[in-house]
Structures are given as structure tokens and as C-alpha cells.
């Protein structure tokens, strides 16, 4: 089973990834980190500050998967090329973000309103790039039943892994992830599938693995922020000790203070 840390804007940056890997990375539960989404610039001029988050030297020892938020397939393919030049193999496409500021622009899960545009986007990406490209998605915009047509579309492309968050766009993060809908559509997925949504305890993660043994991976988000030893515990390891938590939080505090130049900003981030 592959384990992933979900991309969360303002939380899972390079400083957090390094601290988590150092204090809670475990050989028995190796984790790959999705970086918070990057939007390809329309003028194709890369912003150094944003790219610094993905510089290989800024992420030593922490396996990272960059994520793109875009709606232009040709532009996304260009950005994938830039990331591959940095040494990244897999790149993820974000078709799942439900934030209003994102969906209003027709990006993230907002793309799911128009499957013809999703088709054109994916064609623009896969016709111009080679190598592993994964997708993170929601079930639809207003109803889980929309996923039947969405999945049929995804199956036309060589997606290396499909991460499904079983909520619809309109839910944002309210209510519960629709595990029944996920179970309904999982047998029809032709590509490897990763589950994401409402995994906050080791017991929940182990139960999910037992219920869906054919998953290629499990992605945890808020759960791994609240309990950084979650994955380690899920494979039989120890909970976070007081010493580990103190060292982990001290590293975050000092690293953020150095990055922001102010201790108050570090505390706000934490």
C-alpha cells in the first residue's frame, strides 16, 4: 500500500515536509508528499519564490509529487516539462479542489461542470507529455451519480493513479465522505485508485485497507497534521512520544521563524 500526505495550502509546505519526514518518517510506512498546487503562469515565466518550494535541494529525503492546478492542457503540459527538468517523475493534476476562489475560474473540481472541457484538458496534457501523470478528483459537482460519466472519461487516458475524494464539489469539506459511492464505482476503475477523505485515526486507516484491499494507495490530510505519527501507528508502530513532538514542533517553530523573519508569523502558521 502506498501512503500519501495530501496537498494542503499553507500547511504541507517544504518546511513541514522536512520536519515530518525527519521526525515521523518510518521505513515500514514510507510516505510520499503531495506539494500544494502550483498554477502554471500564462506568460510561462516561472516565479522563483514558488519554484523554490519544489527545488530538489529544498526537499532532501522527502519524496515529493508536484500538483498542478490548471484548465489549459497545453500550458499544463509545458509546466510538467519544467517539473520533469527538475527531476520530478510523476506530476498530479488537481481536479478536486472545491474552494470557491478556484472553482469560480473553472479549475479544480469546477472543471467537472463541463466534461467536454475536462476531455480537452486531458487531451492537451497527454498528447504533449510522456511519463506518469496522476489525477486527484471529486465525485462530481452536485451528485455522486455524476461520477459514472466522469470515470468513463478518465478511463480514456493513461492516468497512472486516480485519487478519489468521495465528496462532491458543493459539499466542500462538510458532511461525510461518501464511502458507499466510492465502493460502487471502484470496481469500474481501470487505473490504480487511491482513496482520500476522512481518515483521521490509525484504526480508520486499517479498516479502510481491510474494506478495500485492492487500493493502490491511501492519502491522508487533516489526520496527519493532527497526528503526525498516524501512518506509523497504522502499521503497528508507536504513537508520537512527548520527546518527538517537542523536537518536531521546535523544528517547525525555528524553521518558520527563520523563513518569515518573525516569531509571531511562525506561531500563526503553526
Positions of predicted regions on the chain:
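Flavin-dependent oxidoreductase catalytic cores
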Residues: 1-270
